[in-house]
């Protein structure tokens, strides 16, 4: 019974707040114009197998998951760390399985 009263009180509060002047008087046209003027904030992503050492969170997304910036030391005596965007194997297998299931069911 107490849960019902809490939910009802919450709904009444939300409805009264949404109908009040607290939200503002933005009309649909004004809101659409604001959205049209909004600039894209996302910077260009780093493609798979390209260097991501400048920004380790800039890797692009695959069809389902975001690639991960993986750093390693290459063989050959050079102690310089190399970072590239790569897809983890478990995510690669999950994408392949999902694609096969989609192909089976249409």
Swiss-Prot record:
Tissue expression pattern: Expressed by the venom gland.
Task: Tell whether Cell wall biogenesis/degradation is among the UniProt keywords.
Answer: no
| Pfam families in the cross-refs | Toxin_35
Parts of the chain that traverse the membrane: none
Q: Which UniProt keywords apply?
A: Disulfide bond, Knottin, Secreted, Signal, Toxin
Q: Which InterPro entries does the entry mention? A: Spider_toxin_CSTX_knottin (IPR019553), Spider_toxin_CSTX_Knottin_CS (IPR011142)
Propeptide positions in this record?
21-41
Domain of life where this protein originates: Eukaryota
The secretion signal range is 1-20
Q: List the disulfide bonds.
A: 45-60, 52-69, 59-85, 71-83
Using the record for this protein, list the coiled-coil segments as residue ranges, or answer none. none
Gene Ontology MF term list: toxin activity
**Record-level GO cellular component terms:** extracellular region
Q: Which family does it belong to?
A: Belongs to the neurotoxin 19 (CSTX) family. 02 (D7) subfamily.
Record's protein name: Toxin-like structure LSTX-D4
Q: What is the species listed in this Swiss-Prot or TrEMBL entry? A: Lycosa singoriensis
């Amino acid at each position: 019974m107490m849960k019902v009263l809490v939910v009802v009180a919450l709904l009444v509060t939300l409805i009264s707040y949404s109908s009040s002047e607290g939200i503002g008087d933005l009309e649909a046209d004004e809101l659409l114009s604001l959205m049209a003027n909004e600039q894209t904030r996302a910077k260009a992503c780093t493609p798979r197998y390209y260097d991501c050492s400048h920004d380790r969170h800039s890797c692009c997304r695959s069809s389902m998951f975001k690639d991960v910036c993986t750093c390693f030391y290459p063989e050959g005596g050079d102690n310089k760390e190399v970072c590239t965007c790569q897809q983890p194997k478990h995510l690669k297998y999950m994408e392949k399985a999902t694609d096969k299931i989609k192909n089976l069911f249409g």
